Amino acid sequence: MNYDNKIKMFFEGVEKAGNTLDLNLIDSQFADQFIFADPSGTRVVEKQKFLPFLPKRQEFFKSIGHQSTKISSLEETPIDDQYTMVKAHFLMQFQKASGELTEAKLDSTYILFMKGDTPRIVMHIEPEDLQQAMKDRGLL
């Protein structure tokens, strides 16, 4: 089953929530527990412990000049009737201390549970270590 419009609308919400730090919207987008994976490994995350961390994450990004994040494209791969995998391509804009604007392209992969009114993130995969990715792009 292809969920094109449902996925598009969901990720418009992900983009909005990320740019505005809308914790209520973020709360509605994640399962109560989800798996987070990055180059250092995987871990099960309790959503209620994750949400209080997000303002600190936003402060980190602001400290390196983050202006906005946009989703440039989505690639959906249905798994079955209940789950779909979505690779999201993000374009992040930063303003360096010099005033120069720069962009960083980052990807994330999500496994979404599709039952119910709105999808829920049950797994979030970051292929790069975030701090290293920022260093590699000259932002740290």
Predicted regions and their residues:
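Short, surface-exposed coil-to-beta transition loops
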Residues: T69-I71, K87, T102-T109
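Short, low-complexity N-terminal intrinsically disordered segments enriched in polar/charged residues
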Residues: M1-S28, D32, L139-L140
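Structural motif
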Residues: F30, I79-D80, K115
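Short beta-strand segments enriched in hydrophobic/aromatic residues
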Residues: F30, F90-M92, I125-P127
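Short, cysteine-centered beta-strand-loop-beta hairpins and adjacent loop/turn segments enriched
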Residues: M92-E103
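A short hydrophobic beta-strand element
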Residues: D81-M92
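Short beta-strand edge/turn micro-motifs at domain boundaries
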Residues: E103-G138
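A solvent-exposed, acidic/Ser-Thr-rich amphipathic alpha-helical stretch
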Residues: N5, L23-E75, A88
